[in-house]
């Protein structure tokens, strides 16, 4: 059963690399994950940000999506990156596994983002005055089958080979478990995220019953449309 579940996750998560069609067979390549497609819209992304931070931003134009081109940056791929009010940079990744290298990947990703931002702002880091940069936040939304805590903090310093020396650099990645019963304040604060979790849960449930991924997706999509979970998105993409 565990191996079967892992195969489901592998098929579902393969959508992060390939073109997306809700009723494509599992072998068909996908371009973007469902998650990326949903939260590539500023309105939905702002709702997610507000839920994660208990904030109340209302204007989607306060947000600027700055996700790097995956074709150029495959090793540091992130689902979505954005600026809020130009002074905070948020990296969000959705995953069915918890990768202990998230902090290192985030460090490299942030460095590239800062390089782009400084170039766009025509900043010179060799000048005497302090160059200000957006404050970073790195978040992973986890909904895999492995039991994990509600909240985990992964640290870059755990990767340092010499643990006896106090490091001059640190980076934290917050991992939020969004499975049923976990972080309900976040899910209740963002209906779209909650609907997405329901969709994935239904696909898993259906796959366990019928053993066919394409049919499992089809059945889950029909259910979610009827129940008004991601209805507009699913109708557009079915």
Regions found by a protein language model. Name each.
Residues 2-238:
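Elongated, amphipathic alpha-helical interaction scaffolds
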